[in-house]
Amino acid sequence: MKTPQLPPLIIKKSPSAFYVYTYKNKWDPEKKRSYRASFKKVGTVTSGEKEGRIRWDDHFLAERPELRDFICERKGKDYVFTPMNEGGFTLSQAMEVKQLHAGATWALDQLVVQSPIGEALKTAFPQRRDYLKVLSIAYFIILNQDNNISKYPTFAEATRLPWGAPLHPSSIGRIFREIKKQQIEKYFSALQEGLIEQKREVGDDDKLTLALDSTSISSYANKLPNVERGRNKDEDNLPQINLLMLVESKSGLPIFYRTYDGNVPDVQTVRRVIADNSRLGIQNVVLVSDRGYSGTKNINDCLRNKVGFLLNMKCGISGSLTQELIDEERLNLQDLNRRDWYTQVFQVTKKINWIYEPSPVKNQKSTKKTQESEELYWHIYFDRQIAENARQGLFERIDRVREKLANGKALDENEQTLLEEVFEKHEQDDAVSYSIDNKKVDQKLRYKGYRVLVSDEISDAGKAWCAYQERWIVEDTFKTLKSRLGCSRNRVSDNESLTGKTFVQFLATSIAMIVRTRLRKYSEECKKNTALPMVYDGDCRVLDSLNNVMQTKFCGGYYFGEIAGKRRKLFEALGFRLNEGS
């Protein structure tokens, strides 16, 4: 078979791919030399690099039909042709049989399709099927338990992935840099809409309960704009960025995140999150947060933006409304009739008419005409066991301080603070002695064991307590991100890459949380002795086992290896019923 002859060709790079162009030489009489002109695109290098297989455009194939019988690859500066057989493959391709690890990625594919993630990705990244590339990198992070992208080519060579073509680290870096804030926000909106639609389909019209919390991600790159030194929650002596997430409590699915400079305190981040949710049209939600995010400003911001909330208020602020309400209800919270049998804590609910400014204007004083009011539910709880544990703990710390003072030993920093807080110093002549101030001890213990949750949505104290307890899901999400997926460090050198990589790590965490939620639900529902026993944190071992289900790939198609015994039960634990012939 005669090898086709090609016209003069040149490779040109665009932001997304390498394209093949024909051209004609023209003579420049002034410079007395030829130059290239009349460029026309005729194909694309499918590898994403300068070298690789070329996919010819239809108009070029119509002009040169003989090219249909060959596979053309660019190697160096040469174009190498290989004849194809009747099936459209070369002889070497027809004889090639490849085995890939496929069970885990097949399961992840099904989870993505069944969740709102799949459609949200297509909505946010429609061009060039980029969502498949992003998804493949996320699978790598999940299964490799590492965010070191240099290991991706080796992993992809042996693993069935949504994007089957090679992705070199430089290509992945380009993908990270191309992920923009607008695409991420489009993903958030589509994800939230999909989640609400799924809830409606099963008759659940309740608002989304979103657990809110933040963590710190350390970085070795000191020159990134957002990397600052702050209160590192992992106690690393490294600069960091702060990452705040919203996680849907029932499904365990993270639906929103935002990064902040490492030196921004938690309480200042919520106002921006509330504004973001309002701007993106994320509605019908109730934010559930810990004490780090409570405060009058955040309550007012939630009310202004029509965002539901359940905030855990700080009980230690002297003279606050929280302490005032506790003092008012202290006797009621000793009444056994106020003790809830399910939560096993004493509880009281007070309705407070909360006055706020719906549209504050800078430097303009608020008046009755401009103010509005909202009825808020202040749920006050008392747990005797927590109060007693705090009392005993304080007594033990006081005893250690007294023992060290008696023996002339030095106090550490915490002990010195306690000495100043609850001891009275006595100086007589040259002698110094200390005695315990019982009033100060009582004051230190006065608000121990109490919790105050405030909400504009949840009027029942028991439901509010349960909704708050479910916020552990966001802590589990951070554990998954940082420990399970190995993303406690950002290995990037520029801010554009940081934006994209953070999103892909968020996506990987979202998919991993679906796996964890499915396994946890399966474990809770299993009552038969024959059920597969599940352990907490078992998702890693489950995916490792499924990853050994192989796919044999050949020129005409593929088939999976036999799935039996334990692996069949693992698929069932994730919600997939396989045919007996599988």
Predicted feature descriptions by range:
Residues 494-515:
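Basic, amphipathic alpha-helical segments enriched in Lys/Arg and hydrophobic/aromatic residues
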Residues 1-221, 244-256, 263, 271, ...:
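Dynamic "connector" segments at or just before major functional cores
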Residues 29, 159-165, 182, 202-203, ...:
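Secondary-structure transition/capping motifs at alpha-helix termini
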Residues 519-533:
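Short, glycine/acidic-rich hinge or "gate" loops at secondary-structure transitions
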